[in-house]
C-alpha cells in the first residue's frame, strides 16, 4: 500500500491547524470557537498518524485514539457550557457572555 509522503501529510495538518487557529481568533460565537478547537485537535491527530505511518510505528495511532477521546470529552463539556451560557445570557457571543452582571 502506498502511503502519502510525510511532507504532504504534515503540510495538510499544518494548514488545518492554521485554519483552526484563525477561526479561534476571529470568531466570537462560542459554537464556532468549539468547532475551531476540534479542527485544531484533528490536525494534530493527523500529524501523529502521518508520522507514525512514516516510521511504521503504532505510536501515531495510539496518540490518535488519545486525541479523539480528548476531543470527545472537550466537545461534550463545551456543549454543556454552551447550553448553560445560552440559557443564562440568551446569546452565544463570547464578549456578551463575559460581561459581569451585578
Swiss-Prot record:
It catalyses: a quinone + NADH + 5 H(+)(in) = a quinol + NAD(+) + 4 H(+)(out). Gene3D superfamilies: 1.10.287.3510. One of its GO terms (cellular component) is plasma membrane. The keyword Disulfide bond does not apply. The chain crosses the membrane at residues 6-26, 30-50, 62-82. It comes from the Bacteria. It is a multi-pass membrane protein. GO terms for molecular function: NADH:ubiquinone reductase (non-electrogenic) activity; quinone binding. This is NADH-quinone oxidoreductase subunit K. The lineage of its organism: Bacteria, Pseudomonadati, Pseudomonadota, Gammaproteobacteria, Pseudomonadales.
Amino acid at each position: 500500500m502506498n502511503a502519502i509522503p510525510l511532507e504532504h501529510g504534515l503540510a495538510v495538518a499544518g494548514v488545518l491547524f492554521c485554519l483552526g487557529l484563525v477561526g479561534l481568533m476571529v470568531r466570537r460565537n462560542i459554537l464556532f470557537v468549539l468547532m475551531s478547537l476540534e479542527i485544531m485537535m484533528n490536525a494534530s491527530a493527523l500529524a501523529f498518524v502521518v508520522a507514525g505511518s512514516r516510521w511504521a510505528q503504532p505510536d501515531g495511532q495510539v496518540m490518535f485514539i488519545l486525541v479523539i477521546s480528548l476531543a470527545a470529552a472537550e466537545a461534550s463539556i463545551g456543549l454543556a457550557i454552551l447550553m448553560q451560557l445560552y440559557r443564562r445570557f440568551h446569546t452565544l457571543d463570547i464578549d456578551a457572555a463575559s460581561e459581569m452582571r451585578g
